[in-house]
Curated annotation (Swiss-Prot):
<dbReference type="GO" id="GO:0045893">
    <property type="term" value="P:positive regulation of DNA-templated transcription"/>
</dbReference>
<keyword id="KW-0010">Activator</keyword>
<keyword id="KW-0225">Disease variant</keyword>
<dbReference type="Pfam" id="PF18366">
    <property type="entry name" value="zf_ZIC"/>
</dbReference>
<keyword id="KW-0989">Craniosynostosis</keyword>
<dbReference type="InterPro" id="IPR013087">
    <property type="entry name" value="Znf_C2H2_type"/>
</dbReference>
<dbReference type="InterPro" id="IPR041643">
    <property type="entry name" value="Znf_ZIC"/>
</dbReference>
<dbReference type="GO" id="GO:0021510">
    <property type="term" value="P:spinal cord development"/>
</dbReference>
<dbReference type="GO" id="GO:0007417">
    <property type="term" value="P:central nervous system development"/>
</dbReference>
<keyword id="KW-0991">Intellectual disability</keyword>
<feature type="zinc finger region" description="C2H2-type 3">
    <location>
        <begin position="302"/>
        <end position="326"/>
    </location>
</feature>
<dbReference type="GO" id="GO:0000981">
    <property type="term" value="F:DNA-binding transcription factor activity, RNA polymerase II-specific"/>
</dbReference>
<feature type="zinc finger region" description="C2H2-type 2; atypical">
    <location>
        <begin position="269"/>
        <end position="296"/>
    </location>
</feature>
<dbReference type="InterPro" id="IPR036236">
    <property type="entry name" value="Znf_C2H2_sf"/>
</dbReference>
<comment type="similarity">
    <text>Belongs to the GLI C2H2-type zinc-finger protein family.</text>
</comment>
<keyword id="KW-0238">DNA-binding</keyword>
<feature type="compositionally biased region" description="Low complexity">
    <location>
        <begin position="386"/>
        <end position="427"/>
    </location>
</feature>
Amino acid sequence: MLLDAGPQYPAIGVTTFGASRHHSAGDVAERDVGLGINPFADGMGAFKLNPSSHELASAGQTAFTSQAPGYAAAAALGHHHHPGHVGSYSSAAFNSTRDFLFRNRGFGDAAAAASAQHSLFAASAGGFGGPHGHTDAAGHLLFPGLHEQAAGHASPNVVNGQMRLGFSGDMYPRPEQYGQVTSPRSEHYAAPQLHGYGPMNVNMAAHHGAGAFFRYMRQPIKQELICKWIEPEQLANPKKSCNKTFSTMHELVTHVTVEHVGGPEQSNHICFWEECPREGKPFKAKYKLVNHIRVHTGEKPFPCPFPGCGKVFARSENLKIHKRTHTGEKPFKCEFEGCDRRFANSSDRKKHMHVHTSDKPYLCKMCDKSYTHPSSLRKHMKVHESSSQGSQPSPAASSGYESSTPPTIVSPSTDNPTTSSLSPSSSAVHHTAGHSALSSNFNEWYV
């Protein structure tokens, strides 16, 4: 990536980066003596953020020096010299150059410009490690000589090893040849910003240990799915199941379908899964056996296609019914004349029809009461649960579904002295009147 630095400023040793200038040898020598080595003063056509590997290899023959005190200090800490690492150079005059650049690009006030010598090319302490996993990064910065005073204070223009530039999209991760990302603080910046910067030659090699992206590349949880099918010849005690293990649901289902259920030649469609509650009762068709086996394997191959729902189903019919909750479709209308109730599935309509036919197929096993809807039976069962625990039972609301059969074993009204003093005939009249009042409007009944 190339940056245009604007017009020329020969007084501080900066020429136009877009095009090179020609100077006499005397001018160049005089400027080098007075200002120190400035790699951007002459001959460098542009300011490149990350030089390629062949440019780094020839760094000793360019404006960069091969070694300097900054690199020697890093070597004393245990770093080894590699040809790909850039040495240091004198930065006394170049500091004023970068001070101007930060002022010109709008990088902040004078304090920010004064600390710019640690911001553009120096990472925050401990932010980057060397190529061998070292945490001290002084010897592996882009320009290590500028890092000698960076440990004293943090720069506002470097965020966890990121170089901040004064234009849109100004967060750029450092290239891999100057040290890999090891600090977890830099993950918030490096991971989202790395995409779309291919021309910058940013290389984040995955074989250098844990980096900024590895927390987002978690390994899938390994699971073992065991086949518990018992072959008919293995039914004799002790029963021996298949016990083959699989890592994916697809492999388990394929194994059961091919190896155990069989093809069209099988006439008996019996589930031999271990502890199956059907106990050898056959199915009338193979597809029914296949659907039943999903109860044992846990396979649910039919996901809801609506975004954000996430529900999955073992049978396509259940998915079809479920999708009506999203669409609001209710194709099943009550067939009783005068009732305009509609339902999403036929089973709910069938339960509702008991209201009109006065059928009470849902019987209480603890008393003689019966109900037209299973929800009413569930409410009634709470009365028995509370009475068995010794608490005072609350009267159960009839909701139009309670049977008018006189209570025989347990009745909520037995604890009420006023109700218990009534004769059976008056009690029956009371229930009949209640039913006639509730039957005036079918549409108000809860189903």
